[in-house]
Amino acid sequence: MTLTLDSIAIPELHPDAPITVRKARLSDLEAIHELIGYWAARGLMLVRSRSLLAETIRDFHLALAGEHGGAAGGLAGVCGLHMLAPDLAEVRGLAIHPSFQGRGLGRRLVSACEAEARELALPALFAWTYQQPFFEKCGFIRIEKTNLHPKVWSECQRCAFFENCNEIAMYRELK
């Protein structure tokens, strides 16, 4: 069975399936595109093209649901860490399968990105989001868009909503 919205379909996953977190591979591209597209079609995140996802595939951490009760496994969640400057990276593309909402999987993926940022000795992270309370629970604070690093704006110029952005800027120092 699949969950469908405006021709965007994702496989149904069993919510009790075991979860494994790992870095993305090119073979994961279509599943990532479908999950992000599912939420983008609902207006809850930005669309990401296959070509952009392929360019940035090394940025992403995946949560994979294993087989359970005869149901096939699949992509339960995705989140990326995208380097913007030597002192800043963006947590981006966070999408959780509907069967796994509210189970701590988003936090687990953001933590994986944070751990990678710490390994890289990054002093700070930021995120654009419509989900401010979630990022606050992950230790981020809301900041004014004008306080963001100039490199952020070069990324934003590619966005269809650049002129009318309604996302919230969130920031987290890593200590």
Regions found by a protein language model. Name each.
Residues 1-14:
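Short acidic N-proximal helix/loop "leader" segments that mark the beginning
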Residues 13, 18-32:
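A short beta-loop-alpha structural element at the N-terminal edge
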Residues 33-69, 157:
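Active-site rim helix/loop that mediates acceptor-substrate recognition in acyltransferases
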Residues 62, 73-83, 87-95:
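Conserved beta-strand in the GNAT
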Residues 94-101, 130-131:
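A short, internal acetyl-CoA/4′-phosphopantetheine-binding micro-motif in the GNAT/acyltransferase core
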Residues 102-115, 127:
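Conserved acetyl-CoA-binding loop-helix of GNAT-fold acetyltransferases
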Residues 119, 123, 129-156:
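Conserved active-site alpha-helix within GNAT-family acetyltransferase domains
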Residues 148-175:
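C-terminal "cap" of GNAT-fold acetyltransferases
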